[in-house]
Amino acid sequence: MIKKESFFTEYRVSAVPDEEYAKVSSYIDHFMRAFANTTYKSIYLIDYYKKTFLYVSDNPLFLCGLSPKDVKELGFDFYLNYVPYVEQKMLIEINHAGFQFIRTVEPEERYKYTISYSFHICPPHKEPLLINHKVTPVLLTTKGDIWLALCTAQLSSESASGHIEMTCQTNNKLWRLESGLWKEYPGVELTENERSMLRLTVGGLSIEKIADRLLRSAETIKSYRRFVFKKLEVGNITEAIMMAINKKLI
């Protein structure tokens, strides 16, 4: 049987004294509320030392019909209540693999890394939602352990759960978790014309109008689309836009 403690069997956080909590408590709530007001994503803050959620935004996507207070009080039990059992096991494997990866990174560099993956949440009496979930360290202990981490959730552009990636904000590399092992891949790069095509598409322009704006033919714009679909491993322009935004390519 999976329990909340299953998420922490391979990771122990060094002690965080009360005075450290006193330092951050005065501004964390204000900062998180301000951040929540600027994004369409659901956000929450994990405390790995106390094994709880410190903050949960009021975006309804992630709440499964609960209040932010309810989700905050549930903490990691939220996953056990609202994620399919087979994917609960996947989340635990991701948790363990993520911590194993981060141990290989120098403490001062750990803030730069983000793990991303997709899983289902099951709101009562509704169809399951496939969400993309990202976790980024926010504060470390004096010994370099991850103390607080920012989590974001949004609708996933994938077709199934999984697709586990680790990225670093200072380089174009990415690592994918495959059969329990991290495998390095080159990151996705778009040309300036491909990025412009996506931005103008987001702005509502048709292929013909994008062609006029970029001084290219409509067939050339269509070729940009095909290249983007291949690079991002998607099947249509909506998925391409979501993936490009998700990967911070536009």
Language-model segments: which ranges?
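Short, low-complexity N-terminal regulatory "tails/caps" that precede and couple sensory modules
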Residues: 1-22
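Sensory/regulatory domains in signal-transduction proteins
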Residues: 46-69, 74-162
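Regulatory hinge/linker segments at domain boundaries
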Residues: 170-195
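Short alpha-helical "packing" element that flanks the helix-turn-helix/winged-helix DNA-binding module
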Residues: 194-201, 240
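Recognition helix of helix-turn-helix DNA-binding domains
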Residues: 204-239
